[in-house]
């Protein structure tokens, strides 16, 4: 009888531990979405462990860009450096890219992957871009920071 009670307590204790662990899994798996004062949103999908990208650094990235659907999901892919097999390089914070990129890539570490959700005001705005990006489009980019030169 005493042994049965001990086994039941052990099993109950293990069940509590398992349930607690399962409840924490979604929290650990979902990265926190950050919204900046400008309206840019980003999620670090992978935090790198290399140099930190700062304004005026020359950075090398791979990226894929999508139009955002009305429900917030990724829509049509419109560009990808990965598809071309050619990383994209630019001077960070110098206005060589859309504002959402200048803001969103800063603070990344080499090896990191960040999803940027860029509102129209930080992207191509009312004009759109080259018939590929419509006016007032919200853009989603997945950016991998490959290298930084200070």
Each language-model region and where it sits:
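Cross-family detector of peptidyl-prolyl cis-trans isomerase
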Residues: 2-150
């Amino acid at each position: 009888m005493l042994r049965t009670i001990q086994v039941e307590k052990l099993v109950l204790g293990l069940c509590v531990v398992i349930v607690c662990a399962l409840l924490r899994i979604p929290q650990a798996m979902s990265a926190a979405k950050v919204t900046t004062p400008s309206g840019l949103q980003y999620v670090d999908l992978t935090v790198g462990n290399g140099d930190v990208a700062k304004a005026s650094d020359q950075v090398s990235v791979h990226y894929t860009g999508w139009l955002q659907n009305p429900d917030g999901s990724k829509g049509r892919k419109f560009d990808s450096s990965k598809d071309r097999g050619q990383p994209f390089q630019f001077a960070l914070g110098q206005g060589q890219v859309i504002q959402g990129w200048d803001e969103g890539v800063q603070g990344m570490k080499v090896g990191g992957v960040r999803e940027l959700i860029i509102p129209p005001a930080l992207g191509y705005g009312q004009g759109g871009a080259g018939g590929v990006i419509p006016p007032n489009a919200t853009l989603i980019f997945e950016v991998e920071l490959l290298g930084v030169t200070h």
